Amino acid sequence: MPKMKTNRGAAKRFKKTGSGRFKCKHNHLRHILTKKSSKRKRKLGPKFMVSAADHKRVVACLPYA
């Protein structure tokens, strides 16, 4: 049986934690930042954990993570 392929787009966006969950970066923090409030930009700063609803799809994209 051939090897399963890793989705390279997902590999660049998600990192697996020690507990087996995945973390990734918020969006909307690259450009056009002047109209966004400091509070909004601060909330978008830290990484966040992928929800349980999306976890199965991320695992399918990253079979060797």
Swiss-Prot record:
Assigned keywords, A-Z: Ribonucleoprotein, Ribosomal protein
One Pfam family from the record: Ribosomal_L35p
GO cellular component labels: cytosolic large ribosomal subunit
GO MF term list: structural constituent of ribosome
Database matches in InterPro entries: Ribosomal_bL35 (IPR001706), Ribosomal_bL35-like (IPR021137), Ribosomal_bL35_CS (IPR018265), Ribosomal_bL35_sf (IPR037229)
A single BP term in Gene Ontology: translation
UniProt cross-references to PANTHER family, sorted A to Z: 54S RIBOSOMAL PROTEIN BL35M, LARGE RIBOSOMAL SUBUNIT PROTEIN BL35M
Family statement: Belongs to the bacterial ribosomal protein bL35 family.
Protein name: Large ribosomal subunit protein bL35
